[in-house]
């Protein structure tokens, strides 16, 4: 087995190390966690490790933060070494999230947790925060020899720091083994049939609140597993981090402290938990309401509901923003309701909206956010905090001094896997305005507690690409506007959602638009079925006729080419079906053969 993995590493596709989002035309969501390994095992049985064969393996997950070929290979290799099923081995970039995932599930099931360690006490600096804010209960115990661990009424988690990440002796009284590697992350082993139900829950925590061990770090861990000596490469992480923080301040027009996480959802989780922590400390006993668009992309929606499910005082409130709904009017109504309840309103929203790419009246938005409201008893209600997902337009100045949201408490964040890194890594960042800076220390605390800060390589990639981001956005917008104008000309009956030229002059220059193709049929179901078929016909034409540039991918802000995806709202399987929008979302880059894309689109129109 070890010889086979060595040969796989020698012949693996380059994309295993560099790809951040994968082709959905070779991706089956229901088989995302198993299909890659099953296909790899078939190759292993034939001792086939050719570059061509490895390149034909099905996609492992749709984003690398959920998992990727090298994390699958690492988990499979460790599982073989420990005589486990590969699904019982889960790798993380974070050193603490595996434990937090177990604690979360046990808290929901009201089950005891015992944490056992052989080295120094686990690096959980904020044990009281875990108990008071997250609501987790646990006991700590140090042992010198693992063999003397007794049975326990609940879950026993054994934590150890070890450079050789797979050297574990399974013990029947240990339910979960967490091996921590200071530079790479951690690996969790689920022991025993009675703990198999935890696997999907732990994987979902990795999917939503953290990321899998990164491809580069998985490669190092695999080399450790195979006892291949790895040459230390000197890093310039301090310089890279300083450059990234400086770039974020410049881009956002602010001078507060930026925070950088391993993914957009990692940073969003730190924001949410930081605000919950702040509310519990400063507004004891009050309900916390996270106001979230119901059809926003799956990650935000799902994570907000997961936080609400695990913390009693937190609830999610829907904010209708698309279609016939106006964000400002919806927000005004929701804030009145929350004020009456004397609750704490935290709003998470994208501008422009996703997928309809609409921008609300920003002056009216500021007015609604600034309005003083009363509780049902006539007292002054708690002012809202606006958490702005700026991933579509990270170049727009929303929160700097004198900017449109400078007069209200606001925090802006963006997924770095889009424009900031040009799709080269998953890291995300956030920064508050002056009024919102009161929350920064709490957000930083929870980012540290979850060990979700960006990795050294992520800082390096952001340091390289952030300085050119605004120019890339401008050039990508020009291509997008030209493509949209062409589609309007050759297919005028299609409905396109894209920013107006007037909004573009204000700085809203996204390179993403949604395309609602014309349909036909006697019933709503017939029309919807026909439209979905037409969508897939269009995407198939694009990705087969321009395979080097057009991809069936859910991301945007990429360095080159054009990405297409359906449904536009989510491919993650967590947005409620009735809230999904089965229209095409198209992401255009600054670097692509636009004329060829026009040609293929025109051929598609003629074939309709």
Task: Locate predicted features.
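Conserved beta-strand positions
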Residues: 349, 388, 515, 586-588
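Active-site C-terminal subdomain of aminotransferase-like
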Residues: 189-243, 411-579, 588-593, 600, ...
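Conserved PLP-enzyme active-site core in the AAT-like
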Residues: 5-8, 13, 20, 90-210, ...
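A generic secondary-structure signal marking the coil-to-beta-strand transition
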Residues: 88, 257, 409, 509-511, ...
């Amino acid at each position: 087995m070890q010889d086979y993995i060595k040969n796989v590493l020698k012949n693996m596709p380059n994309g295993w190390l560099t790809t951040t989002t994968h082709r959905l035309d070779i991706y089956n969501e229901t088989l995302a966690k198993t299909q890659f390994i099953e296909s790899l095992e078939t190759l292993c049985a034939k001792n086939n490790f050719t570059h061509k064969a490895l390149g034909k393996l099905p996609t492992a997950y749709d984003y690398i933060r959920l998992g990727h070929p090298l994390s699958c290979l690492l988990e499979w290799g460790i599982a073989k070494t420990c005589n486990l099923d590969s699904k019982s081995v889960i790798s993380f970039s974070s050193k603490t999230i595996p434990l937090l995932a177990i604690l979360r599930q046990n808290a929901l099931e009201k089950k005891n947790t015992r944490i056992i360690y052989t080295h120094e006490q686990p690096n959980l600096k904020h044990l009281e925060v875990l108990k008071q804010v997250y609501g987790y209960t646990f006991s700590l115990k140090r042992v010198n020899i693992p063999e003397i661990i007794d049975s326990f009424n609940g879950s026993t988690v054994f934590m150890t720091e070890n450079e050789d990440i797979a050297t574990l002796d399974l013990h029947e009284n240990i339910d979960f083994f967490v091996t921590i590697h200071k530079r790479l992350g951690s690996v969790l082993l689920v022991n025993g049939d009675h703990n198999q139900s935890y696997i999907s829950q732990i994987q979902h925590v990795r999917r939503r609140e953290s990321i899998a061990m990164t491809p580069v770090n998985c490669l190092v861990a695999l080399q450790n597993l195979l006892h291949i000596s790895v040459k230390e490469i000197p890093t310039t992480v301090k310089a890279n981090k300083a450059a990234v923080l400086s770039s974020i301040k410049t881009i956002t027009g602010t001078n507060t402290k930026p925070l950088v996480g391993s993914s957009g959802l990692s940073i969003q989780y730190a924001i949410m938990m930081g605000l919950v922590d702040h509310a519990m400390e400063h507004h004891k006993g009050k309900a916390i309401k996270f106001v979230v668009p119901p059809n926003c992309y799956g990650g935000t929606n799902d994570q907000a509901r997961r936080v609400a499910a695990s913390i009693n005082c937190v609830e999610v409130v829907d904010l209708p923003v698309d279609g016939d709904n106006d964000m400002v009017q919806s927000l005004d109504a929701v804030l009145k309701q929350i004020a009456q309840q004397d609750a704490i309103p935290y709003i998470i929203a994208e501008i422009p909206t996703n997928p309809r790419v609409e921008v609300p009246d920003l002056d009216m938005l500021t007015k609604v956010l600034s309005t003083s409201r009363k509780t049902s008893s006539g007292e002054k209600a708690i002012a809202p905090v606006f958490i702005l997902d700026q991933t579509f337009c990270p170049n727009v100045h929303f929160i700097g001094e004198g900017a449109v949201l400078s007069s209200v408490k606001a925090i802006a964040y963006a997924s770095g896997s889009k424009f900031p890194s040009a799709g080269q890594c998953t890291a995300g960042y956030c920064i508050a305005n002056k009024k919102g800076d009161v929350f920064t220390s709490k957000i930083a605390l929870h980012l540290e507690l979850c060990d979700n800060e960006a990795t050294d390589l992520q800082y390096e990639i952001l340091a390289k690409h952030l300085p050119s981001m605004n120019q890339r956005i401008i050039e990508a917008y020009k291509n997008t506007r030209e493509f949209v104008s062409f589609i309007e000309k050759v297919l005028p009956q299609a409905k396109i959602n894209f920013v107006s030229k007037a909004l573009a002059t204000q700085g809203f220059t996204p390179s993403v638009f949604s395309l609602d193709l014309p349909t036909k049929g006697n019933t709503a179901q017939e029309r919807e079925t026909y439209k979905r078929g037409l969508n897939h016909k269009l995407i198939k034409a694009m990705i087969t006729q321009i395979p080097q540039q057009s991809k069936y991918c859910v991301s945007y802000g990429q360095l080159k080419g054009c990405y297409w995806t359906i449904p536009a709202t989510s491919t993650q399987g967590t947005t409620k079906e009735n809230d999904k929008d089965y229209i095409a979302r198209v992401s255009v880059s600054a670097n692509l053969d636009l004329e060829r894309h026009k040609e293929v689109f025109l051929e598609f129109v003629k074939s309709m």
